[in-house]
Amino acid sequence: LRDATFAPPRALTQLAQITDFDLFVSTTFDSFLEQAINAERFQGAQSTEIIGYSPNRVADLPTERENLQRPVVYHLLGRVSASPTYVISDEDTLEFVCALQSEHLTPEKLFHELEYNHLLLIGSNFSNWLVRLFLRMAKRRRLSDPRDVGEVLADDHSGSDERLMAFLQQVSLRTRIYSGAEGFVD
């Protein structure tokens, strides 16, 4: 996979064109987002900074978001590598999520940025409970607590998940749901 030359999906190319976005958190282990950003912003030059989380080696942002010199793609669930340091199963997901909640294994600068900035979760295929857990981890407080920033979920299934919708309507009024990742970036 590391040497494969697949083209990034059109939705990622469109997302990469939004130059106000400089910090991307990916839950996939592929390099499509990196390729799209490099193609759209740097004429294909390898200029995007790539960081991959691993429970056995915490990698954090090099600096606060406002001081980033170039776009960053942070692979929250790992990235393709020779060693098994990326998520490919439900058990892997569980281990990564548990590690991310551990005081000593949390990328602090990244989670500070997630806590104090608006979030766009686009195209994820997280289950109902994983969406809830990710939002809670990112915001570092109860979702029902008042906050100045909101979240947008743009995917193919969250809007039709009645239990997730009921939960978000009850406790997270700042979260907005849009149907379809590709339609959202159009």
Predicted regions located by residue number:
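Active-site glycine-rich loop that binds ribose-phosphate moieties when present
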Residues: 52-61, 89-108
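Basic- and aromatic-enriched surface patches that contact anionic nucleotides/nucleic acids
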Residues: 25
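SIR2/sirtuin-family catalytic core signature
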Residues: 6, 10, 17-22, 40-46, ...
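Metal-dependent phosphoesterase signature
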Residues: 1-5
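Active-site glycine-centered loops adjacent to acidic/histidine catalytic or metal-binding residues
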Residues: 28
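Residues at the C-termini of beta-strands that transition into short coil/loop
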Residues: 54, 77-80, 179-181
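Class I SAM-dependent methyltransferase SAM-binding "motif I" and its flanking Rossmann-like core
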Residues: 73-82, 86
